[in-house]
């Protein structure tokens, strides 16, 4: 079986969040760096740091929690398109998550971007995941 790096990112963040961990370490690839950059820009994580150990690159993510520490800041991360079932959308049919409050991450011909950027540029692509 092949590895799904995007599902791995989502699962690592979700598990660390449920376990109330402050940091999570994931393998660094071009795809993971682009997705983490979008998640950071949207404010779902606090900080990203590159780390090298035994000739392997990792990203160390600092998760964002509520100030009172009773709950997590991020609510839901969901993988949409996967290796067995690819989901594509043109720019007019990109779904709006939580009335525009959530984020859809797409893989387009111009790189990985959010739903807002794809609509602005008028391009569609593969829907990778939802964050809301």
From Swiss-Prot:
It holds the Pfam family Ribosomal_S8. It is found in: Plastid, Chloroplast. It comes from the Eukaryota. Transmembrane segments: none annotated. Keywords: Chloroplast, Plastid, Ribonucleoprotein, Ribosomal protein, RNA-binding, rRNA-binding. SUPFAM superfamilies: Ribosomal protein S8 (SSF56047). One of its GO terms (cellular component) is chloroplast. GO terms for molecular function: rRNA binding; structural constituent of ribosome. InterPro entries: Ribosomal_uS8, Ribosomal_uS8_CS, Ribosomal_uS8_sf. PROSITE patterns: RIBOSOMAL_S8. GO terms for biological process: translation. Its main location: plastid. The keyword rRNA-binding applies. Part of the 30S ribosomal subunit. Belongs to the universal ribosomal protein uS8 family. One of the primary rRNA binding proteins, it binds directly to 16S rRNA central domain where it helps coordinate assembly of the platform of the 30S subunit. This is Small ribosomal subunit protein uS8c.
